[in-house]
Amino acid sequence: MTQYIVALTGGIGSGKSTVANTFAALGVPLVDADVIAREVVQPESAALRAIVQRFGPAMLSADGSLDRAALRARIFSDPAEKTWLNGLLHPLIQRQTEQQLRSARAPYVLWVVPMLIENNLQQRANRVLVVDVDRERQIARTISRDGVSREQVENILAAQVSRQRRLACADDIIDNSGRPEEITDRVATLHQRYLALAASATRQDKSS
């Protein structure tokens, strides 16, 4: 049976984690691209050794883990090095993602992918759910959460697709500019919809 996949995406500071955790509280399994990206560069991993071999020991924190800030700074202004890093990590992330998607045992799985549209991955999902907020709210939330400057947030936003492009790819949208309980209600409604869609897809699988 093919796993029914709902892809959750949204710009930085939109509240993807809040929405994902609300689905998880309803028993929906999560496959989180950011978590997988951290797992493939754990201490002693082949990928981390390759990064240190290429960029030097300054890429390591005191505890032996990857210093993400140092790596970001190293590749930010060097497209060739960024291409090398993506070539190393993307196949590992993709393999781990596919394994987790296939092994999920539930009517549907929530696949959390911040750069879903940017990497043109939306075709892998049965349904695309976008968490949406206005730009100023994104900036304010990210500054508050990460302790970064407005300029840094705007640079990140510039590397992401536009709000309009993301919304154009959405099957469903959660407006995360309101009260937390509004998110809970909206997720509960979508959960029932996805259960019905997954059940329908399963019936079609069996009849074909």
Curated annotation (Swiss-Prot):
Database matches in CDD domains: DPCK (cd02022)
Protein name per Swiss-Prot or TrEMBL: Dephospho-CoA kinase
Pfam family for this entry, one: CoaE
Catalytic activity from the UniProt record: 3'-dephospho-CoA + ATP = ADP + CoA + H(+)
GO molecular function: ATP binding; dephospho-CoA kinase activity
Family of this protein: Belongs to the CoaE family.
InterPro entries: Depp_CoAkinase, P-loop_NTPase
GO biological process: coenzyme A biosynthetic process
Subcellular location: Cytoplasm
Keywords carried by this UniProt record: ATP-binding, Coenzyme A biosynthesis, Cytoplasm, Kinase, Nucleotide-binding, Transferase
Gene Ontology CC annotations of this record: cytoplasm
HAMAP family in alphabetical order: Dephospho_CoA_kinase
SUPFAM superfamilies assigned: P-loop containing nucleoside triphosphate hydrolases (SSF52540)
Pathway: Cofactor biosynthesis; coenzyme A biosynthesis; CoA from (R)-pantothenate: step 5/5
NCBIfam families to which the protein is assigned, alphabetical: dephospho-CoA kinase (TIGR00152)
Described function: Catalyzes the phosphorylation of the 3'-hydroxyl group of dephosphocoenzyme A to form coenzyme A.
EC number: 2.7.1.24
Keyword Cytoplasm: yes
Ranges where the DPCK domain occurs: 5-201
Positions bound to ATP: 13-18
